[in-house]
């Protein structure tokens, strides 16, 4: 596969932060960190564009994003469930996690977009786990009452993004 095809394939991933320019906003909000952990890689738009940390870890249960990763710096790629990895990782407090899980089915325009779907209970488990971790976290998604209820103490920022279905608010 040539580089042009590979690049198109990665940036064309559903929920990609590359096409809308959303990645610049997300990267600009990142606090200093020694270890960068990105879960639910998808098209790797953030991982490929942010400056490298001392340690970089990309996690996805789907092997396809891992095999398509062609970033400019070394990344430990992990083909595993994000919940499992995050709950067993040995944290130092110098980590930043960027988490962009599949969008809730109830708030998206198409129900058949992900090869590895999340149930509502999977979202609850993930959010509960993220709240318990001793590090900085940036979480992407569309506004939802589930996220608002479970993360009511978290700071939220809304950004406008252009999607295949038109403009949407990322939160």
Label every PLM stretch briefly.
Residues 1-171:
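Class I S-adenosyl-L-methionine-dependent methyltransferase catalytic core
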């Amino acid at each position: 596969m040539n580089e042009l095809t590979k690049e198109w394939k990665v940036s064309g991933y559903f929920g990609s932060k590359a096409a809308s320019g959303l990645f610049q906003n997300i990267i600009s909000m990142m606090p200093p960190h020694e270890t960068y952990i990105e879960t639910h890689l998808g098209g790797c738009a953030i991982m490929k564009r942010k400056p490298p940390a001392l340690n970089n870890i990309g996690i996805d249960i789907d092997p396809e994003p891992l095999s398509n990763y062609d970033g400019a710096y070394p990344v430990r790629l992990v083909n595993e469930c994000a919940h499992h990895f995050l709950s067993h990782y040995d944290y130092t407090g110098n980590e930043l996690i960027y988490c962009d899980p599949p969008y809730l089915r109830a708030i998206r325009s198409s129900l058949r977009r992900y090869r590895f779907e999340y149930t509502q209970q999977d979202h609850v488990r993930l959010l509960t786990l993220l709240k318990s971790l001793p590090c900085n976290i940036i979480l992407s998604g569309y506004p939802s009452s589930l996220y608002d209820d479970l993360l009511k103490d978290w700071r939220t920022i809304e950004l406008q993004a252009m999607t295949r279905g038109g403009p949407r608010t990322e939160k």
